């Protein structure tokens, strides 16, 4: 998690052309894998996803192949990934059932669970941000004390494209039991309230 990663300049033009959500890292900035994981999970930083994919697998294509292999291992029979960001591609498809399966498996990993349930994270000083900067969860930072009947929302990951609509994978605790809820295709846009 402490491995340094430099964000390559060539990933930014395509992400900006697609109006992708960015965490705030800059081309040539060096941050840790941990910082980029928080950047991917909290503010949906596409630049973090791209940089991590290249760091882990050498290329976006090789990483996507690993994503599809893991999906098959998990029995996600209606899922096919085309990129590490979740940005629209007509062949990049899944279902809420498959996303719930992935969320359940991922939550078994202690590091992922911490990322999924964190409201804010401060990136320490980097070569481009000498004061560091703070990122907030696109879900938890907007809930502001909202509670469920006899429960609470523990964490979640939002997503949005014009084609997919508003999407959400969330973890809640109700009466001492944990529940995963995945929704997709909701109306609105990336600035619509998450509830």
Task: Walk through the language-model features, giving the residues of each.
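Active-site-adjacent loops and short helices of periplasmic peptidoglycan-processing enzymes
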Residues: 1-97, 106-110
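Domain-terminus/edge residues, biased toward the C-terminal soluble/receptor-binding domains
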Residues: 76-80, 88-195
């Amino acid at each position: 998690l402490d491995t340094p990663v430099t964000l390559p300049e060539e990933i930014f033009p395509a992400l900006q052309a697609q109006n992708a959500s960015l965490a705030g890292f800059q081309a040539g900035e060096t941050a840790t894998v941990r910082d980029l994981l928080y950047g991917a999970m909290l503010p949906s930083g596409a630049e973090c996803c791209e940089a991590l994919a290249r760091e882990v697998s050498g290329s976006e294509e090789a990483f996507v192949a690993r994503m599809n292999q893991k999906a098959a291992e998990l029995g996600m029979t209606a899922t096919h990934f085309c990129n590490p960001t979740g940005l629209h591609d007509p062949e990049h498809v899944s279902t809420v059932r498959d996303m719930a399966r992935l969320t359940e498996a991922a939550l078994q990993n202690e590091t992922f669970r911490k990322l999924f349930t964190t409201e804010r994270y401060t990136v320490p000083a980097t070569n481009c941000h000498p004061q560091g900067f703070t990122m907030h969860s696109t879900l938890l930072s907007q809930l502001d004390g909202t509670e469920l009947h006899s429960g609470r929302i523990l964490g979640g990951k939002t997503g949005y494209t014009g084609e997919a609509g508003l999407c959400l994978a969330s973890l809640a605790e109700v009466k001492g039991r944990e529940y995963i809820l995945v929704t997709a295709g909701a109306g609105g846009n990336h600035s619509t309230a998450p509830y």
